[in-house]
Structure formats: structure tokens, C-alpha cells
């Protein structure tokens, strides 16, 4: 058998990356895939004796919240996703991981790397996994961060006012997992440090007290994150960030770390031209299985916490579009300034897609900020049907010496 501890150093992340499409769950192709789509996949797991599927509780609106168990190992690992209903990226990746664990492949004749079979065997032999995908199904259906009660579940670890929050704490106390993965999405405009690099993936070993001390429980999380970061840096160099570690006494991640489970937070952000987050889904698949392998093999013990501390802190340094040094006419005034524009999503009720509405959010000196797209507009002026200003929709033309250079339509360059 190939030693996975050695294999990891030689590129387990590359093998997982190259193999993801084999295990891609084809019933889920968009972020807003809906509760029933996930239920259908979970019900399908019951056909395989590898999985024990049970209804852990019901949501406020009566939807089932499932607990999926697999593996026979001593080390217990619990993973939950979508405690915020509009944060689905990791749920998609978990569906792919279910396919990997049950060795459910696509219909291609593509040869499977034998290292993946060894990985699967090691994970299931050394670990017992507990998955809770879509912990907030009511929020997922309504496409909102909050539960049906209007409560942010990740601020309910103490008050326990939601059935979903009550379940999460009960599972942690009953199962006593050694390791936990708290899986979220974040605003896609966060940057990795004060840079123009979108923080496509961000990690955090959550703090368990106000002074953010590092005990053995939290140190293990930092070490695992180092390996996960190494796996995805190959594909998103300088686009991995570290979430702010300020202690939040009401949050589950902070409390679960305090209760003795090594807790790893993963936040999926933005990646250019990936509105449905299918590429970020792939990176979740790679990073999660890498992290699980490090737990199963205990390879994380070889990692240095210093590498975790070197990850750049997330910053809000990015807009969707920045137009620099453009000439603007407003009333009797003519001046040169930068424009910062964002396109904001709005869910369409009952549908699996979104509409977008652009807005000019800043006018002035944007030299310390970055745009996912940028235009250097020196010598250009804005021509628009209506006078532009803060809050205006970004519909206009950029003209230089009477010649049309760019058309901006709803915040996009055409």
C-alpha cells in the first residue's frame, strides 16, 4: 500500500484536483439548488451500506435535517454546512465527497489513480465521519442567512433559540467529535490581505477565548489548515486568506473550539468568472479531503503553526469594477476622479438564478482599493442619459475625443 503521508507531500492535492470531475454530483450544478435536490441525493445514500442516514431533527418549518454517518475508525470527525441558508458552496462539495467515499464515479472510462482508493480506505478505516449538510434548510429555501425565526444561527450557541442551533450543540455534546469543520461562504469581494487578490478560500482556527490563546486543541486546527492551504495554493496562489479571529462568545465555531473539538472554519469567497462557484466547489473538495487525510494519517503534526500565522488577514479591498481618472461632469462642475462600482445579486423568488443591479458606491480617490475589473480612463469622460452620482446605476459610456472607448452596462464592461 502507498503511504499517504508521503503521497501528500508529493501532491495529493494535485491528484484530487485532477480527479474531481469524476466524482462531481451532476444533479447539483448551480448554487441555488434547493432543499429537495439535496434530499434526493441523501436518500440515495441509503442504498449503500457504507452510510447510516438518519433524521436528526426537523427545522422550524418542518424540513428534515439529516445526519449521515460513515467509517469505522476511532477518530471522530463532524462536518456541517449551510448553517447560513445562502452559503451553499461546501454543501455542493460534500455531495461530491459522498460520491468519492462510496466510489460512485461518472460514466467515463477515465483511469482512477490508485492513490484515491488508498485514501478512501484509510479515511474509512481510521475515522468515523458525521455529516450534517444544509443545517438550515429553511434559510436555504428562502435564500437567506437566517433561520425561519429570523435568527442568525451562528449567534445562537448560548441562547439556543433555534431548533437547528439546539441540534448542533446536542450533536457536539453527544458525539464528542475530535475534529469539526464549520463550512461557510463569505462576501465574494473580500481580499487576501490589502491586495487585489480575491480571498477565494479563507481559513480560521477559531478562538476559544477573548485573548485568543493557542492551546493544543486550537493548535491542531492551525496545523491542519497549513496542509489544506498548501493543497489549494497550487491553483489560487496568493488568494487564500485568514478570517479575522476576534472571539465571538455567541458563535458556534468559537464555542465548539472551547468545548474541546478541534474546529476548522472554511469560508468560500469569490473567484473571477465563477458566479455559480463551481470552481470554488472543486477547491473545497480538494481542501476538505486533504484535511481529512491529514487527520487520518496524523500528518498534520509535522506542520508548523508559523505557516498558519503567515496567511494574510482578509480585508475589504476589492470592488467589482474600478474606473480610474475619469472626467465627470456634475452640474456646473467638471472634475477627475475614480469610480468604484459593485454589482449586487438579488434572488428571484422560486427560481434558481439571480438578477444583478449595479451601483456606484464610491467617487473619489480609490488608489488604495482594487477592482476585479479595472479601466484606466485618463483622458476619457462619462456620457450618460442621466447625471451620475453616488447610488446611481452604472449605465454610461466612456468617450475620448469624441470616440466611444467603453460601454458600461449595469456595471459590466461591454
Where are these regions (language model features)?
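Hydrophobic h-region of N-terminal signal peptides that target proteins for export
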Residues: 1-7
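Short beta-strand-to-loop junctions in surface cap/lid or active-site-entrance loops
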Residues: 66-74
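C-terminal accessory segments enriched in acidic
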Residues: 8-33, 175, 202-414
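Active-site/substrate-binding loop(s) of hydrolase catalytic cores
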Residues: 74-78, 83, 87-238, 257
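Conserved beta-strand scaffold positions in the cores of enzyme catalytic domains, especially
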Residues: 53, 67, 131, 180, ...
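Alpha-helical scaffolding within the catalytic cores
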Residues: 62, 115-118, 247-253
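Active-site-proximal beta-strand/loop segments in catalytic clefts of secreted hydrolases
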Residues: 56-57, 70, 81, 133-136, ...
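Short glycine- and acidic-rich boundary segments immediately preceding or forming the N-terminal edge
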Residues: 8-65
Amino acid at each position: 500500500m502507498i503511504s499517504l503521508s508521503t503521497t501528500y507531500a508529493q501532491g495529493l492535492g494535485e491528484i484530487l484536483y485532477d480527479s474531481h470531475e469524476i466524482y462531481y454530483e451532476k444533479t447539483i450544478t448551480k448554487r441555488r439548488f434547493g432543499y429537495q435536490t439535496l434530499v434526493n441525493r441523501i436518500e440515495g445514500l441509503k442504498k449503500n451500506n457504507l452510510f447510516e442516514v438518519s433524521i436528526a431533527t426537523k427545522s422550524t418549518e418542518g424540513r428534515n435535517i439529516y445526519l449521515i454517518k460513515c467509517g469505522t475508525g476511532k477518530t471522530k470527525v463532524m462536518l456541517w454546512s449551510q448553517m447560513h441558508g445562502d452559503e451553499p458552496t461546501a454543501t455542493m462539495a460534500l455531495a461530491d465527497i459522498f460520491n468519492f467515499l462510496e466510489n460512485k464515479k461518472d460514466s467515463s472510462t477515465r483511469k482512477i489513480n490508485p492513490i484515491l482508493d488508498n485514501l478512501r480506505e484509510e479515511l474509512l478505516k481510521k475515522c468515523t465521519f458525521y455529516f450534517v449538510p444544509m443545517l438550515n434548510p429553511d434559510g436555504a429555501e428562502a435564500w437567506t442567512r437566517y433561520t425561519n425565526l429570523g435568527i442568525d444561527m451562528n449567534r445562537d450557541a448560548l441562547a439556543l433559540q433555534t431548533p437547528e442551533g439546539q441540534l448542533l450543540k446536542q450533536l457536539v455534546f453527544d458525539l464528542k467529535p475530535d475534529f469539526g469543520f464549520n463550512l461557510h461562504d463569505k462576501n465574494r469581494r473580500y481580499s487576501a490581505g490589502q491586495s487585489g487578490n480575491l480571498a477565494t478560500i479563507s481559513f480560521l482556527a477559531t478562538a476559544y477565548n477573548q485573548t485568543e490563546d493557542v492551546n493544543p486543541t486550537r493548535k491542531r486546527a492551525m496545523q491542519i489548515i497549513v496542509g489544506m492551504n498548501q493543497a489549494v495554493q497550487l491553483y489560487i496562489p496568493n488568494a487564500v486568506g485568514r478570517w479575522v479571529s476576534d472571539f465571538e462568545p455567541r458563535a458556534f465555531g468559537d464555542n465548539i473550539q472551547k468545548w474541546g473539538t478541534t474546529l476548522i472554519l472554511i469560508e468560500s469567497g469569490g473567484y473571477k468568472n465563477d458566479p455559480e462557484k463551481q470552481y470554488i466547489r472543486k477547491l473545497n473538495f480538494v481542501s476538505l479531503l486533504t484535511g481529512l487525510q491529514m487527520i487520518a494519517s496524523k500528518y498534520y503534526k509535522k506542520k508548523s503553526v508559523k505557516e498558519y500565522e503567515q496567511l494574510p488577514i482578509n480585508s475589504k479591498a476589492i470592488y467589482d469594477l474600478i474606473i480610474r481618472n475619469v472626467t465627470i461632469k456634475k452640474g456646473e462642475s467638471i472634475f477627475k476622479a475614480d469610480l468604484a462600482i459593485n454589482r449586487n445579486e438579488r434572488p428571484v423568488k422560486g427560481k434558481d438564478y439571480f438578477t444583478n443591479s449595479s451601483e456606484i458606491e464610491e467617487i473619489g480617490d480609490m488608489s488604495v482599493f482594487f477592482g476585479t475589473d479595472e479601466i484606466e480612463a485618463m483622458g476619457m469622460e462619462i456620457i450618460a442619459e442621466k447625471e451620475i452620482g453616488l447610488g446611481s446605476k452604472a449605465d454610461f459610456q466612456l468617450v475620448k475625443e469624441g470616440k466611444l472607448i467603453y460601454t458600461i452596462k449595469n456595471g459590466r464592461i461591454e
